[in-house]
């Protein structure tokens, strides 16, 4: 038996084990009648009401939850359920305009069951540990801690030598290819009824591209979408210091040449998948220089300490708002106590980072304006 034949045999054994595990995960879900059981739909229907019970539509939904759940479950089981229209509006978040498509609460009930009972159990096992956006036990600050750990690990081996490759996707949600999502469904969801339902949610966006912001299955689909790229970086390229948060990637390499070679490989693989790479934000930076990841500034000192600073634009906004509130307090529209309560928001944000100096500056500015301590 040649080495090539042994390699092929090992590959086939791995494929067989993966297929067996995938089948076991799908068998654990059960048929569509068990996944969308009345109990599960009622439970997640109540979950949808949390935090929005002041809305009239939510109150009507909860008032008729018993009968409405039975009606929607009947439509799902006989294959006549279709996603309804969404309420479209735009948000301007820190200067970034984001189009939001909010589904009706009746559709949110179905979406939540699909996400919690189907997409999460089937997608998460194929995702790397360093992909924890919108996942239980994860989040943005989880990724800050992981990046700090990866920087310290690299420093212990290579010191300040090396480089980072930072990558960002362009229009990650608006230009998501539906064909890639359907391909993932065919590989992950073996039950044809559940796969058809997941395809319906994707097909609700016309044009064959794009996933809406504000829809729960959309968020889970997009988190897991680049999993093949993640596994290529982690498994095939064997890069320990690599992770991504939604559309933001970083990889830590021992040299600038290795970072440039990895950048070409990763960008080529991403574009082959149909994902658009933002060339303006994708770059190679020296390990010894500070860089930004998800609006936070990271820097490794000569002693190996990792310093993390919050977004500096927040200080500009806080100072501008304090001067605005000064005029409102003078006119009687606000009280000093209300301003002090608001100031806790930027202070609490910067207390998560190595920004004690910025916290002191905000407190001093508040004292200079209102002659009292916060």
Where are these regions (language model features)?
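Right-hand nucleic-acid polymerase module
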Residues: 1-16, 103, 108, 112, ...
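Short Gly/Ser/Thr- and Asp/Glu-enriched loop/turn motifs at secondary-structure junctions
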Residues: 86, 243-247, 279-280
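Non-catalytic, polymerase-adjacent accessory regions of viral genome-replication enzymes
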Residues: 1-70
């Amino acid at each position: 038996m040649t080495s090539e034949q042994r390699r092929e045999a090992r590959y086939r054994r791995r494929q067989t084990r993966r297929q067996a595990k995938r089948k076991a995960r799908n068998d654990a879900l059960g048929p569509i009648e068990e996944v969308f059981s009345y109990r599960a739909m009622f439970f997640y229907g109540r979950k949808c009401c949390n935090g929005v019970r002041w809305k009239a539509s939510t109150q009507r939904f909860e008032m008729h939850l018993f009968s409405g759940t039975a009606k929607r479950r009947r439509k799902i089981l006989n294959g006549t359920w279709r996603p309804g229209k969404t309420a479209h509006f735009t948000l301007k978040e820190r200067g970034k305009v984001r189009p939001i498509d909010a589904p009706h609460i009746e559709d949110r009930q179905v979406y939540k069951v699909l996400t919690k009972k189907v997409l999460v159990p089937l997608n998460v096992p194929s995702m790397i540990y360093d992909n924890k956006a919108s996942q239980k036990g994860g989040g943005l600050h989880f990724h800050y801690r992981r990046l700090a750990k990866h920087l310290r690990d690299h420093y212990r081996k290579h010191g300040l030598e090396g480089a980072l490759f930072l990558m960002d996707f362009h229009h990650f949600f608006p230009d998501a290819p539906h064909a890639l999502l359907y391909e993932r469904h065919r590989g992950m969801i073996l039950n044809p009824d559940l796969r058809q339902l997941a395809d319906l949610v994707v097909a609700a966006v016309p044009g064959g591209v794009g996933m809406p912001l504000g829809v729960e299955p959309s968020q889970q689909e997009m988190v897991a979408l680049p999993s093949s790229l993640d596994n290529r970086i982690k498994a095939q390229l064997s890069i320990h210091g690599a992770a991504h948060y939604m559309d933001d990637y970083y990889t830590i390499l021992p040299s600038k040449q290795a970072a440039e070679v990895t950048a070409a490989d990763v960008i080529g693989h991403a574009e082959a998948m149909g994902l658009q790479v933002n060339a303006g934000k994708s770059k190679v930076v020296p390990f010894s220089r500070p860089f930004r990841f998800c609006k936070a500034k990271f820097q490794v000192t000569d002693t190996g300490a990792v310093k993390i600073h919050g977004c500096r634009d927040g200080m500009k906004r806080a100072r501008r708002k304090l001067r605005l509130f000064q005029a409102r307090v003078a006119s009687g529209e606000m009280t000093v106590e209300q301003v002090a309560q608001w100031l806790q928001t930027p202070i609490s944000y910067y207390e998560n980072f190595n920004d004690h100096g910025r916290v002191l500056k905000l407190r001093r500015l508040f004292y200079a304006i209102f002659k009292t301590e916060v």
